[in-house]
UniProtKB/Swiss-Prot annotation:
HAMAP family membership: Glu_racemase (MF_00258)
Pfam family for this entry, one: Asp_Glu_race
UniProt keyword annotations, A-Z: Cell shape, Cell wall biogenesis/degradation, Isomerase, Peptidoglycan synthesis
Molecular functions per Gene Ontology: amino-acid racemase activity; glutamate racemase activity
General function of this protein: Provides the (R)-glutamate required for cell wall biosynthesis.
EC number, as in UniProt: 5.1.1.3
Biological classification of the source: Bacteria, Pseudomonadati, Spirochaetota, Spirochaetia, Leptospirales
Family statement drawn from the similarity comment of this UniProt entry: Belongs to the aspartate/glutamate racemases family.
Residues that, per the record, bind substrate: 11-12, 43-44, 75-76, 183-184
PANTHER family: GLUTAMATE RACEMASE
Protein's name in the database: Glutamate racemase
Amino acid sequence: MKEPLKIGLMDSGMGGLSVLKELLKYDSELEIVYYGDLKNSPYGEKDASEVLELVRSVCNFLQKENVSAILLACNTATSAAAQTLRKEFSIPIFGMEPAIKPAILQNPGKKVALLATPVTQREEKLQRLKSELKAEELVLSISCPGLAGLVDQGDFDKAEKYLRPILANLQEQDVENLVLGCTHYVFLKQIILKNFPNVKIYDGNSGTIKHLLNSLQVPRVILNGSQNNRSIYKLILNSEKEFHFRLASELLSLKE
């Protein structure tokens, strides 16, 4: 009997669970190892060199778990580490791409707000993407230090208070399109829509998972409601706190 393909997913904490949820929508027979580096979260306010060391350490752990590929399910980790680690590891390393391209192409000439961590906002990867799209004048970059940490703590009331003035300001500027440049923020979609009802939200999860499955030659068939998922996953949260495992379970079952 053929062994299922084993894939590693990593994030600084809970954000990558939004990517895992996307992966579990497909009728694929995968074995997934998810590593949340909560002992060292959040990554978004650290130096890029420190993030690189942390991500390298997690990838070494996942390689010892005999995964065939690793997805950095974290925009900050991708910005700071993906390019370097692809040269160091013999297995494929995939990363996240903020959904700036579809947001710009689907809304020609219109402003697009990008919510992301300080590391993602200042790294060369993002500047290069904006330049390629000739979108430097259209993308409003908004750094959100501390917001991912509120998701890791499950403090959605504080997250809403944090976002309210940002969203009010965007509405005053007639911004209609919002890119979530951090996988943690995907869990804040309902809060965003409650405070900014007509905004169009873009995130990179769907495109990333399609690219991952295509690259690994895994059939892309969406599960229907009556099918059971054949993939299995293991959660490793290095905080080892019961609270985080409960929160992970809640986030994975959250309705979109």
